[in-house]
Amino acid sequence: MIRIGILGYGNLGRGIECAIKHTKDMKLVAVFTRRDPSSVKILTSEAKVDSVENILSYQDDIDVLVLCGGSATDLPVQTPEYAKYFNVIDSFDTHANIPEHFAKVDDAAKATGHFGLISVGWDPGMFSLNRVYANAILPNGADHTFWGKGVSQGHSDAIRRIEGVVDARQYTVPVESALEAVRSGKNPELTTRQKHTRECYVVAAEGADKAKIEEEIKTMPNYFADYDTTVHFITAEEMKKNHSKLPHGGFVIRSGKTGWEDENNHVIEYRLKLDSNPEFTGSVIIAYARAAYRMHNEGKIVAHTVFDVAPAYLLDMSADEIRAHLL
C-alpha cells in the first residue's frame, strides 16, 4: 500500500483526497495544514489532520508527499524544502519558471536520495506530454493551445482584489473561428486576442462604482488588457447558483505536413472537458504519485517531470496486464 501525505487542504487537496479513494493500492495517511488542525474537516475517517509544524515526524510513515500550495509563493519554497525529507510531487504551473524550480528540487532531492516530480497536472502535465508526442511525430508543423471554456482561478482572484468587488469568476473562452482555422490545418498565426476571450461575472458591493470596476478589469495589464473582455454584474445568489463549480478544459493541436513535397496535411488534437479542474488535476497527480513511488523503489532519485515517466508506471496493473488489455 502506497502511503500518501497531503500538504495543504484547499480545492486541490480535496481533489487529491477524492482521487485516492478511487485507488486500491494507496491510502491517505495525513493532511498537513498551516491552519488550526481542529478547524480542518477531511473526508477520510482513518487519516489524520496535523499541523505542518509536525510534518517531519512522519518521514517513516509517508511514501509520497503531495504538495498542494500555490505556484506563486508556496511551491518555490516548499517543494525544494520537503524534497530533503520526502519523495515529493507538485503541480507547479508557472511555465517560465519551471527550469529554475526543477534545478532547486533536483539539488535537494539529489543531496538526500529522494525522488521529486514537479509540474504534474494537465497544463503543465497532460498537455505537455501531448505536445512532445505530436512534435516527435510531426516535426514539420506548428503547435496551438487553447484553454477553456473554464474558470481561471488566478484571473478570478485578480478581479476580487479590485476595490468594490465582493466576488468574481472569470471564464477563459476559446474563439471558435480561431479553433476551426487551426483544425483545418491552415496553421494561422494568431494573436492573443484572436485566440481567446475573457468573460467575467462580478458581484459588486452595494454602492460600488460599477463603471470604474469594469474599466479596471478591462485595462488590467497581464490579465485582461490583451483580450476582448466582457463584464457581467450579477447578484451573490446568482453567483452561488450558476458559478460555484470550477470547470475547465482546453485543446492541444498540432498540424503538420508529410510527404516528399509536403503534400499531405495532418492534425493531432487532444481535448479535455472538465467539470472540476482540481479533481481532475488531483487524479493526474495521484497516478504520478504511484509512478514516483515505484521509480524510487527502483533506486531512482533527483527531480523529474512527466517527460521522464514511462506510462506503465502510472497504472495499478502488471506489465502483462497492460500488454493484454491496453496495447
Predicted segments, located by residue:
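Rossmann-fold NAD(P)-binding glycine/threonine-rich loop
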Residues: 92-116
